[in-house]
Amino acid sequence: MINYDLTQIRAIVFDVDGVLSCSTIPMDSRGEPVRTINIKDGYAIQLAEKHGLRIAIMTGGHNEDIRLRYEYLGVEDVYLSCAVKVRTWEAFKERYGLRDEEIVYVGDDIPDYEVMQLAGRSEEHTSELQSRITI
C-alpha cells in the first residue's frame, strides 16, 4: 500500500480521455468520439465532493456531453477544449484561492504533463511521460 499525506489536498482535477473514460474511443458516424464512462468513477467523484473536496474536469475534448455528465454529478468546474491546460489550471487556482500543492491532478497524456509538474500530487504516468518527452 502506498501511503500519501493528503491532508492538505483541497481539490482534485481530472482529465477525461484515458482517465475517466477508456483511452480507446470509438467514433460515431459524424466523427465524434463516443466515450464510455465508468459508473464507479461517478460514485467516487460524488463521495469526494461530499467530503469537501472541490472537483474539476479539464479536457481537450469539446463535446457538451462531457459537461452534462459531470454537471449531473455535481461538478461545477468543467473545462472543455483546453488546448493549453496550464492556463486553465492557473485560472482554476485563482478562482478558488488554491495553491499547486493543494491540488491533485489525474492525467495520462502529453497535454497533461505541464500541469502534472505543478500539482501537489499527480497521477498517472508522470515518470513514463518524463522519460519520453522534452518540453
Regions picked out by a protein language model, each given a short descriptive name:
Residues 89-113:
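Conserved Lys-Pro-Asp/Glu-containing loop-to-beta segment of HAD-superfamily phosphomonoesterases
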Residues 59-63, 104-110, 127:
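Glycine-rich beta-to-alpha transition loops that act as phosphate-gripper elements at the mouths
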Residues 20-51, 60:
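A positional/architectural concept
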Residues 123-135:
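Single conserved hydrophobic/aromatic residue that forms the stacking wall/gate
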Residues 45-69, 79-80:
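Substrate-recognition element of Asp-dependent hydrolases with the DxDx(T/V) motif
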Residues 45-50, 90-97, 117:
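Surface-exposed amphipathic alpha-helices with a cationic face
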Residues 1-16:
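Non-catalytic pre-domain segments flanking phosphatase-related domains
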